[in-house]
Amino acid sequence: MSWGSTAKAVTSTTHRTLTGVRAGRHTCYDRLVLDLDRGGEGYRVRYVSAVHDQGRGAVVPLRGGAFLQVDDQSQAYRRIAMPSVAGYTTFRQVAWGGSFEGYTTIGLGVRARLPFRA
């Protein structure tokens, strides 16, 4: 893992279920965590001009100066509650982007295009 602002991706054949999303504040960074029912990796994280939801492709409204689209190779069988990031240094909003055919999308609005680690 390394810090940077370019897209990061890992593929997997493991079928997982997304069970929760949480956020944390640290001295030098904010952190977003996707809780899954089992291990394995399979994700893509990248800056986009707009986050699009799974299935329909509609734009997910987000606050912030830049937007990260987090696509995880996991299924969510119900809409997952998104954490509040009020008062965070970098995060502006976390939004549900849907789950469809084994992929789940989370939108993350941040204050500016900054390096991230996935």
Residues covered by each model-derived region:
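Short linear recognition/processing motifs and adjacent strand/loop elements at protein termini
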Residues: 1-118
